[in-house]
């Protein structure tokens, strides 16, 4: 969609394989759970504060441009790498059930002392700062 004024988009459970929100620069909430997405580009969605993209096939998620994100639910995907490095990360994160997740980019190792990541097995992780 080219609707730059779109603030909320709920397109979950539609069997979509592709979603382009690059022109929706004022998007604040995106719900695209229960689809068949393999990628999701939110680099232009700097106003995004809630992202729900669980139960897809997403392998990488880069949220480095999402400076106001408050809630991320990306559980049950095929995530290998998750980029949370944005200089001010303070969001609630649920990335459970991503068995191949071995790379999380963060600004500080202290981020992993918070509740959102207490359930992950860090033995297989590489931390990037």
Question: What is each PLM-predicted segment?
Answer:
Residues 1, 22, 43, 64-67, ...:
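C-terminal helix/turn sub-motif of individual leucine-rich repeats
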Residues 80-129:
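Leucine-rich solenoid repeat scaffolds
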Residues 7-11, 28-32, 49-53, 70-74, ...:
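Conserved hydrophobic beta-strand positions in leucine-rich repeat
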Residues 1-4, 15-18, 22-26, 36-39, ...:
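Thr-biased low-complexity repeat/linker tracts and other Thr-enriched repetitive architectures
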Residues 14, 35, 56, 77, ...:
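Consensus "Asn ladder" position of solenoid repeat domains
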Residues 7, 24, 45, 107-109, ...:
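Compositionally biased, intrinsically disordered low-complexity segments
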